[in-house]
Amino acid sequence: MYSEWRSLHLVIQSDQGHTSVLHSYPESVGREVANAVVRPLGQALGTSSVAGSESLLKTDKEVKWTMEVICYGLTLPLDGETVKYCVDVYTDWIMALVLPKDSIPLPIIKEPNLYVQSILKHLQNLFVPRQEQGSSQIRLCLQVLRAIQKLARESSIMARETWEVLLLFLLQINDILLAPPTVQGGIAENLAEKLIGVLFEVWLLACTRCFPTPPYWKTAKEMVANWRHHPAVVEQWSKVICALTSRLLRFTYGPSFPPFKVPDEDANLIPPEMDNECIAQTWFRFLHMLSNPVDLSNPAVISSTPKFQEQFLNVSGMPQELSQYPCLKHLPQIFFRAMRGISCLVDAFLGISRPRSDSAPPTPVNRLSMPQSAAVNTTPPHNRRHRAVTVNKATMKTSTVTTAHTSKVQHQASSTSPLSSPNQTSSEPRPLPAPRRPKVNSILNLFGSWLFDAAFVHCKLHNGINRDNSMTASFIQILLSYKSSIATQASMEFRRKGSQMSTDTMVSNPVFDASEFPDNYEAGRAEACGTLCRIFCSKKTGEEILPAYLSSVILNSPPLFCCDLKGIDVVVPYFISALETILPDRELSKFKSYVNPTELRRSSINILLSLLPLPHHFGTVRSEVVLEGKFSNDDSSSYDKPITFLSLKLRLVNILIGALQTETDPNNTQMILGAMLNIVQDSALLEAIGCQMEMGGGENNLKSHSRTNSGISSASGGSTEPTTPDSERPAQALLRDYGSTDSAAGLLIRSIHLVTQRLNSQWRQDMSISLAALELLSGLAKVKVMVDSGDRKRAISSVCSYIVYQCSRPAPLHSRDLHSMIVAAFQCLCVWLTEHPDMLDEKDCLKEVLEIVELGISGSKSKNSEQEVKYKGDKEPNPASMRVKDAAEATLTCIMQLLGAFPSPSGPASPCSLVNETTLIKYSRLPTINKHSFRYFVLDNSVILAMLEQPLGNEQNDFFPSVTVLVRGMSGRLAWAQQLCLLPRGAKANQKLFVPEPRPVPKNDVGFKYSVKHRPFPEEVDKIPFVKADLSIPDLHEIVTEELEERHEKLRSGMAQQIAYEMHLEQQSEGELQKRSFPDPVTDCKPPPPAQEFQTARLFLSHFGFLSLEALKEPANSRLPPHLIALDSTIPGFFDDIGYLDLLPCRPFDTVFIFYMKPGQKTNQEILKNVESSRNVQPHFLEFLLSLGWSVDVGKHPGWTGHVSTSWSINSCDDGEGSEPDEITSSEDVGASIFNGQKKVLYYADALTEIAFVVPSPVESLTDSLESNISDQDSDSNMDLMPGILKQPPLTLELVPNHTDSLNSSQRLSPSSRMKKLPQGRPVPPLGPETRVSVVWVERYDDIENFPLSDLMTEISTGVETTANSSTSLRSTTLEKEVPVIFIHPLNTGLFRIKIQGATGKFNMVIPLVDGMIVSRRALGFLVRQTVINICRRKRLESDSYSPPHVRRKQKITDIVNKYRNKQLEPEFYTALFQEVGLKNCSS
């Protein structure tokens, strides 16, 4: 209003009219001169009034010299009569402008205006506070003020310059006394009412006789803003503005308009001679003289004035707290009084007020305020931050709201309000608004910005516009009253007696304790809300309220349906109508000039999010018609009939779909996408229940359902046409009729079609929307609803098309963010394939998916429509990036290894085999097997084969060659027990191997045996006669001598013995031959016996073709090793690295820590103790926990447990010994603390991720002996195949646990203790980035900002933060803000309100849960789990250092190859294959 005018502050500061020449002399000189000069004048003044003597001063020089002395005398202490004489003299002399007297010097009578101006400046010195004699100063100040009043009222010759000096004098003395913080019992507190009263009265007189120029109005407005911590300022302002309004209404609306009567005392403040034009100008300027009255609710603004700042530092230089100033404790009452004054003005313009008997402004009788209990029982939030509000006074149509955070002030809820009286019943009819009342828009133009801002006092704001949920029930009247008729208004009034409260009563009231005063502004808020209600209720038929105000209602009411307000559901149909007007409108042209269309749509979407669960939750419960269709434009509107909540579902769904089609803002779009998954999943769960139950019942049963905590009854799943009140129909029938339009399958199909179409058109350029759309598609894939395969194929095909488009974008557009979108698309594709593996049974779908995988790995497709087929071997790999290639490889692994194979018989906790070298060694039957009995080979630099050639001695057939292979690849550790199968399995037991067919026994009967003496010559030789020649040869005896005869005899004897011996041997041989069986095993021909010892590793590699010379050669022009290499397991550290590799998970793992927070709790110990007993928590909390995952034993669990010290272990406890503690636990009420990670955790896993849900609880400290035992057990362990953090007893091949755990259940360490006990220097894999999410169940929503997350950081340790390269100092400052928190607040309706903190990052918000959403009991667990998965996936996408699990494993395999490769020549390699392993190390 006065922006182009200059304030008079500089003029006032530079004016030295209040100083005297005596100020230049020593203080003793001035005091003596003043005492000597002023005493005769004062005494003469006392006698002159009786004797009529003239003044001692005759000339102008004498008067001016004397005035210099009096000016100094007014600054003296009040211990003497000097100051009193000075005041007496000056109050007598200023009457020269009223009625000249003889006691007044003649020069003053001649030029009264000039001298009075100087006197007024001198009198400022009197009002400077003194340290003592406060009562004397008050008496003298009142004497001056009464003289000023008389001067202004009665003077008729006062010039404009004198009026201006008089106004500046009053402004200055008010500023001197009222601007600083009030001192209790001080002069300012006693004079405040009189000071401000005189100022306003004189100002009104000046308006009549000499209207102040704009600089004076601007100066007055600025100075009054510094005095508002005095109740009298607002009180006097309220009186003046009401008196002016009473006069204004007389000539503005004529005599027929209901008069606005004010007390005569207040009416007399307005000079009778003030004309109508002057009244109007003065009224508008006085209305804004108080500045923005909403500032009165903010102590930070009130205490930011210069005088406050001067005293803001104490003597030690330390700033004081705001609560140190008692005057600020009055602000709630002052704020209420200001709002009440504005309320009276509104009532006056509406013509619905009646006069009051006291001096306060009138009390409106048409108060549509809530009963006192409604305002009192609403607990205000703790630690609310103050809010500074700035209003554009030029237009008065919109307000710019900014937030200023100051120190938090604790408070407690008060049971009574000192500003409100008990409820009273009006005994007379409530008057209707005047027929000639102004339009609603006109009143809102004047007071709207103040009232709307006052209605949100101490309500936290987000992004400057979106209000949080801290509104009390009072503001809800704005909306209730807007659609309510006056005839149906409640008869209870909420009357406040604020004006009748004395200052002493207010100060002594305990409600104004220093720690509570900022939160007692509800009375002023309620007054503003009630005023807005009356404004909206006075809308005439056919009158249109400006979009600026209607949009403000929508803009400021997103949490309206989240606050457990009784009866708020009455306005649901009307809000739906408003949303149908706003959200489908793409342009919102009629609202653009008043609000930001994006913010308006965002608020509308927030309201929609809170309305979506209502149809399913309340079902066919009818909404009672209390509005009677009074505000419907159509007389035949369905609003006149009872409607069911379920009948609103189709309208809400259509609004949701329409909003998505017209929305362009990324944040708003993501909120809608989150809502879509909410409604689809809720519908699917409801229909699943409805199909299982056939429930009949009357309306009473349905109504009772809506009031109970079940929330999952099939009755709420029914459907009824809006005009058919079939509330007694069974759920199945209702679902059947309603399913044709918005069943779960229909919603799923509509969602898939709309999202996939926009994903590949409008959204593919926007990263945040694309990620949210892909997350929605991933969530829709998990919805258990039967839909046609064509719709599922559409989703898969759209994701593939999205990947093709992103990969084909020009190279300059490729960035990390773009590749993150492609990676997210591959992850979405994996979700669809694992949830619907049968989709790959279709040839075209399989082809499309594999082409996308090929595109991701190689950078191009082998077959394009316009090109010839290019074989993969001929292509040069050129992927979009290594991250894209890694994502495509993970998809290929998912297709080849997980589809149809998950979960495995070992359970979903581990997709890997639960055996390792330690297990195989322990349960093989050969004592010679040890860790060196394994042969280690590497295939293609990516797969490590650990081969055990000795048979395990179990169900394997020992006759056949067998080999046990531990395959460690990118996808995990797999164990294969293989045998060379040479015969059909059924033939092994029935055939005798290697035994020839039996032959008949030979016949030994060969006939008669004849004894024939064989002759050397035939018998005919003896018959031949001798000739003479024959006789020439002598006989032997003739020529044998005696010597020869002896020799001959020896020879004959020897020959006889030999013949006898040979005969004996022949007979013996014949006897043995007769005794020998047939066939002779010595001479019989039979097949060779089977081999008993095999080098099965060599056979295995050879049979698979790995032992070719080409496989052993180094590739040309490449740094890669050969296709097959051997590893040397004797090198120190080999088995540690193998165990390190086994520690690397093959799936992403996430951790969720769940807390329960009862009302008023602020410390971590209080919160942790809540879960120790089920009696301390709500039953829904335990149900919610079990909906997140299933319970697993930490000691037996092979998956992620929430801490690295117990995760991914293939060891277990003995069933017999482990069951006893479980039985003891089940007999005790341990509540949710059983899932604190010591014995059990809640666990969820699918093919792509695993989550551990931990409920931290207090843990007693361990004794020193226990700590030493733990260290001893670690050091004594002989399982050196794994790193120390996983040295626990092994598991058998049959998965039969037979060993006790290393620690008893009572001795287990809490997560925080484990973090501290983890030994330094032990290898911990690089598992980051750490993905932790906290879920907090809060019974009271206002306690959210009190949640001690920083104190609980030690309880949400996973051990990942202990990895190398992590700085302790860095963790302490970054961990808290890196942990997203999901707050869940149960509403009285059985629904749940969601609050998200810290889940926004580089990629904006995460769905499906968004801030402010309302969720049903059915869908809560699913949505929380899905949100956690998406949050952690987003976090991994954001991280520059994150590598997928298969990449980390591949890198570790490469590292192992480089460190332990056995660099042998081909002959040496082949030679080693034929050598035995392990025998030389049997003793090791």
Swiss-Prot record:
Keywords: GTPase activation, Phosphoprotein. One of its GO terms (biological process) is Ral protein signal transduction. It comes from Mus musculus. The modification Phosphoserine is found at residues 359, 421, 710, 1275. One of its GO terms (cellular component) is cytosol. Component of the heterodimeric RalGAP1 complex with RALGAPA1 and of the heterodimeric RalGAP2 complex with RALGAPA2. Heterodimerization is required for activity. Residues 1302-1313 have a biased composition (Low complexity). This is Ral GTPase-activating protein subunit beta. Residues 369-381, 392-428, 701-725 have a biased composition (Polar residues). The modification Phosphothreonine is found at residues 363, 379, 724. Non-catalytic subunit of the heterodimeric RalGAP1 and RalGAP2 complexes which act as GTPase activators for the Ras-like small GTPases RALA and RALB. The keyword Phosphoprotein applies. PANTHER family: RAL GTPASE-ACTIVATING PROTEIN SUBUNIT BETA. It comes from the Eukaryota. GO terms for molecular function: GTPase activator activity; protein heterodimerization activity. Residues 1138-1382 form the Rap-GAP domain. Abundantly expressed in testis, pancreas, lung, thymus, brown fat, and white fat. Expressed at lower levels in the brain. The keyword Lipoprotein does not apply. Residues 355-437, 699-728, 1297-1325 are annotated as: Disordered. Signal peptide: none annotated.
